[in-house]
């Protein structure tokens, strides 16, 4: 069961939305400080909570997770059912934003780690054009299915992909393998590397702000 997400908006004249998924074991509160630092009042930020589930890799411990993780590497064996369930939940949030008056092409899907995997998975299959994707410290899940399942609507959607050179949770090798797949299928990937581990840094936040301003620039709604 997916709970009510956190919403952050400081302006009545919202004309864009970012749906931002947290990483394994966290919740929607995890990126509230980052959203506040971005200072983008024309954007509504939606921060959903993943459901609790038993995570095989963590000895079956129950925690918030967008899908189960079975092996030592995220792509050793994948929980397609869990990934697809989370995709449907995020698509429902997109539909909600559209109903509230924000068109799909003014919506960005964002996420960190597991959340970034869901952002990529969902965006590349979504049937309407989205404004962009923020894929932070993550990888492309179910990558062997992308060619058959992708939507041409988001073939040219800008993807901001960032990774820490010292990341030991999702290695740079894993991330760059995903980058290569995206580039081979002609996706528009804006690649960034930072001197950090499995986290975010101030330089990255500044680059995220620049990206969001580029794809969701304020339309000055009165």
Name each model-derived stretch.
Residues 2-108:
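Serine-hydrolase catalytic machinery in alpha/beta-hydrolase-like enzymes
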Residues 98, 105-154:
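Primarily recognizes the serine-hydrolase "nucleophile elbow" in alpha/beta-hydrolase
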Residues 173-222:
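C-terminal catalytic histidine-bearing segment of alpha/beta-hydrolase fold enzymes
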Residues 53-58, 140-145, 169:
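A short beta-to-alpha transition loop/helix N-cap that caps and shapes the active-site region
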């Amino acid at each position: 069961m997916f709970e009510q997400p956190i919403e952050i908006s400081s302006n009545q004249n919202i004309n864009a939305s970012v749906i931002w998924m947290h990483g394994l074991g966290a919740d929607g509160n995890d990126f509230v400080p980052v959203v506040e630092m971005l200072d983008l009042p024309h954007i509504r930020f939606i921060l959903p909570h993943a459901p609790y589930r038993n995570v095989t890799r963590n000895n079956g411990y129950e925690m918030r997770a967008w899908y189960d993780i079975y092996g030592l590497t995220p792509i050793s064996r994948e929980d397609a059912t869990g990934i697809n369930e989370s995709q449907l939940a995020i698509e429902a949030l997109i539909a909600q934003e559209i109903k509230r008056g924000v068109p799909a092409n003014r919506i960005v899907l964002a996420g960190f780690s597991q959340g970034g995997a869901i952002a990529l998975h969902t965006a590349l299959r979504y049937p309407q054009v989205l404004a962009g994707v923020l894929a932070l410290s993550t990888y492309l899940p179910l990558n062997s299915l992308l060619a058959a399942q992708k939507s041409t609507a988001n073939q040219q959607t800008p993807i901001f992909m960032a990774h820490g050179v010292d990341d030991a949770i999702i290695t740079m090798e894993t991330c760059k393998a995903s980058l290569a797949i995206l580039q081979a299928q002609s996706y528009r990937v804006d690649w960034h590397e930072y001197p950090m581990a499995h986290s975010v840094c101030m330089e990255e936040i500044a680059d995220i702000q620049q990206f969001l301003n580029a794809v969701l620039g304020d339309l000055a709604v009165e």
